[in-house]
Amino acid sequence: MSLKIVYFGTPQFAATVLADLLHHEVNVVAVVTRVDKPQKRSSQLIPSPVKTLALSKNIPLLQPEKVSDPQFVEQLRDFEADVFIVVAYGAILKQMVLDIPKYGCYNLHAGLLPAYRGAAPIQRCIMDGVVQSGNTVIRMDAGMDTGDIANVSFVPVGPDMTAGELAEALASQGGEILIKTLQQISDGTITHTPQEASKASIAPKLSKEEGFILWDHPAEKVYAQIRGVTPAPGAWTLYSYQGKPARRLVIRKASLSSSQGVYGHPGDILLSDQQELLVACAEGAICLKEIQPEGKGVMDSKSFLNGHSGHKLKLSLNLMS
């Protein structure tokens, strides 16, 4: 395949896809990624996973502050690319950029468009209890994930799958569907199908507050919320005992409780017959497997309970508790 490709991408998801394209000898003439960002609690700048991969392969790299910068746009034109491939780049491309490549710009979206347009299709579909996701390749236009569909592939969403695990499954499949698309462009067999606007939905980026667990919902809905925000922005709650101020408790791993006859008010901490830490929900309960109390490391629920022996623990139902 002789098509010249400029690849736009930033996080690990995009790096996994890029690695697959390079493995199959796709002709990537340049890579565009976001500028390095400071590490949390440090001023040290951290390169994106895509940048690290591009440098290791000696691929020309661009990191514009703004994709509308005239100098950057001219640099893109100089590559005389046939196609731009965009995978989780993290910024909206202006029409002046979309018009540069000979055959247009194609985006790999980690969701089944037109549903879940936006930044968080993976997390949102799990939180909604969807059982099937997938990748959609679209020919980009000026809208947000509104372009015509070129190809679609499907990935089942397992009942215990987290957002992180679904992202890995989608990324591992992403290279294949893009290679198929590029081959169709090269052969002149590519087709495009307009999205059905009536079936569109939005998947905006999750806030940290959306990781706060709402225990007064049924356990299945709570479990979907936990899985959807794992690993980021992360599931958390507030716990208190003996009248002390509430403290944050991060939930690293959980499951639906199989215990029968769980009784308690939403947010009550209970023990199962197997001495598991359960949290009562509006219906059913959640079993906490691995947790991280504020100011401490990750631990299993037994260690947490041992550290609070004799104390009646209570989880908050809202952020004001």
From Swiss-Prot:
Gene3D superfamilies: 3.40.50.12230. Transmembrane segments: none annotated. Keywords: Protein biosynthesis, Transferase. This is Methionyl-tRNA formyltransferase. Its EC number is 2.1.2.9. Attaches a formyl group to the free amino group of methionyl-tRNA(fMet). The formyl group appears to play a dual role in the initiator identity of N-formylmethionyl-tRNA by promoting its recognition by IF2 and preventing the misappropriation of this tRNA by the elongation apparatus. HAMAP family: Formyl_trans. (6S)-5,6,7,8-tetrahydrofolate binds at residues 111-114. SUPFAM superfamilies: FMT C-terminal domain-like (SSF50486), Formyltransferase (SSF53328). PROSITE patterns: GART. It comes from the Bacteria. InterPro entries: Fmt, Formyl_trans_C, Formyl_transf_N, Formyl_transf_N_sf, Formyl_transferase-like_C_sf, GART_AS, Met-tRNA-FMT_C, Met-tRNA-FMT_N. It is an enzyme of class 2 (transferase). NCBIfam families: fmt (TIGR00460). Pfam families: Formyl_trans_C, Formyl_trans_N. It comes from Chlamydia abortus (strain DSM 27085 / S26/3). GO terms for cellular component: cytosol. Belongs to the Fmt family. It catalyses: L-methionyl-tRNA(fMet) + (6R)-10-formyltetrahydrofolate = N-formyl-L-methionyl-tRNA(fMet) + (6S)-5,6,7,8-tetrahydrofolate + H(+). GO terms for molecular function: methionyl-tRNA formyltransferase activity.
